[in-house]
Amino acid sequence: MLTIHAADLLLPGGRGAPVPGGAVAVRGSLIAAVGPYEAVAAAHPQARVRRWPGVLTPGLCNPYGPELLERAYHPDPREADELGREPLTGDALAALEMTDARWGASARRGAQRMLAHGTVAVAGDLRRGAVLDAVTRVGLGREERFSEPQGPPSLDPFAGRPVTEAFLLPLGPEGAGADFAVFDVPVGGDPYAALREHGARTCVATVLGGRLVHRRR
């Protein structure tokens, strides 16, 4: 079944110009078309249509893979009263008894939080087997990291760098992997400034390998 994802504005990445009322058609795990909604819908009249508010962009790469998944603990919701809801690092992490099973569960929760920020891949070497397994099961891609990222680790790939540097790969051409995200930010002005100002926490949908893996309710 082919699905068209349409948004108020599409930023294809790379050298592509913004497309007001843009859309991406997805067949299986691959992109079938990218462009104005009217053209994409005319080419695929039988497709199911999902409409999203805001800006549709390429999927994001978080540069802090090891820091967020192997050097931080993401508490289970059942531990919230004791540990809170935010990732634990430093002395708070050192005080925990961390088994392989606990690292794996933490990484799964961390990966889900990444998906909720439009992330489709992480950069940096992951060395814990339980963490690698969790990342693989969730479906996040893994990218090589050639230098240490600047600034504190963040779940927001837009934080501390130009928005376009967070994009993993430009959208398209036909046959490319269907990895993208949608952010509910204003589209009346500079969309890049809006993404930086409001951040990846505004993500309303993440598509990874053609699957809708996150949808904000």
Positions of PLM-derived features:
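N-terminal metal-binding scaffold of metallo-dependent hydrolase/deaminase domains
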Residues: M1-A43, P162-G199, V207-R217
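Short, charged, surface-exposed secondary-structure boundary motifs
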Residues: G59, G151-F158, Y192-A194, R216
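Long, charge-dense
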Residues: E79-L83, P87, E97, E144-R161
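Alpha-helix-centered segments that form part of catalytic cores
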Residues: A94-A116
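Active-site loop-helix segments enriched in His/Asp/Glu that coordinate
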Residues: H117-D156
